[in-house]
Amino acid sequence: VPLMEQHRYLDLVKIILATRETIPLERPIHLFGCGHPMLFPMCIALGADLFDSAAYALFARDGRLLTPDGTVRIDELVEWPIASRTLHSHTPEEVRKMGKKERTDLLARFNLEITQAELARCRQAIRTGTLWALVEQRSHSSPELREAFLHITEVISKGSLSENIVGQRMIEASAPIRSGSVKWSEKADHRPHLIHARGLIDERWCPPPFDWTGKPMNNPKLLLISGGVPPWRDSVRGDVIRSLRRDPQCIPVILMKAGRLPFDLEDWSPLCHIQSVSFEPDMSSDLMDGALTEYLDVKGSSLEEASSDKDDDAIRTWLERSQISAKCSVLLGMERNKAWEWLEGMTVQRSSTGRIKNVFDADGVHVLSPRLNDGGLSLTTSGAIALHALDAGLPEVV
């Protein structure tokens, strides 16, 4: 296919995006003529399901070997660029001395082996939620592929989720929020599942309606927290409680490499699992425009102090209610005020480690359970009925 022979990968991306925008997600996309392993991760991430190509044989006929990072010629090799069952008993010199047909057959089997291996790698990456990390890695194989990748990051991060239909559909199709750590890199913040998570926070999160004393939130200030490590409920909660004791009208927000994370979403995957080296925090914030800020730098571990103070008990209860209501807002699409009202008088059941595993309403009915593996929420049947009775609308799938 001339498009790919000429390395016009940016045009290829635009074609797939245009196709994906119009074809229903349940319909498979068959990409004819795409047979280079280097392109598989990107095309699969964009929505391609099937590939049809004789590239493995055509490249072998010209003495070229396919690899996940590009193409190499047999004439240039002293060692094989990648291990394979097909070529392990031969040296490049021995293969060059073979007859045309024997050499072509051998290289074709090698190319087909590498092609199948890369497809298997992509399938496994989908299962583990690391496909976009693989796309980013492969994008460094050529300038043209890198250009195409950067265009993708611009498309999926443009505007809000509700306005960016193409980006939204790509995210919905390829990046469910899942547990597991994310290694930070230059373009990690453009991975769909991180864009999805930040987009939900930007569009749905707002401060709780009341502080822990029961007073309405009136121009609260941000408590920006830096220096802690996940899980933040262990490393910074003691500092958060002491700060709230001094000033109930503040909202704790964690400063991360990926941006700012409200403390009431501190255990929500994937944002709670980002791995990165230490960094200088960005003191700006778009969570609450114009809000006053207080900066709290946590040095090392900050374990919560043992205390029988009733205020501390009230703060802990408020933090739990704030966390559940924030997740109802961000994950279920509820208004924060309605979620807060719904949870009035809630009681909880804890795991052996002290984390909340079941939430009961004021009447003692089990309404939801926080998922300890990814920080999400699972509604019970009773909880879903109660949610519907609040006229909060149907929960959105995220």
Where is each model-derived feature located?
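Hydrophobic residues within beta-strands of alpha/beta enzymes
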Residues: V1, I29, F51, S301-A306, ...
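Glycine-rich phosphate/ribose-binding loops and adjacent secondary-structure elements
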Residues: V1-S89, G376, A389
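A structural motif corresponding to the C-terminal end of an alpha-helix
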Residues: T22-R27, W318-S325, F360-D363
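Short hydrophobic/aromatic-enriched beta-strand-loop microsegments
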Residues: D49-A55, Q349-S351, V367
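C-terminal extensions of enzymes
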Residues: H88-G345, G383, A389, P395
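Intrinsically disordered, charged low-complexity linkers and terminal tails
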Residues: I315-W318, S325, S352-I356, L372-G375
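C-terminal capping/extension of enzyme domains
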Residues: V365-V398
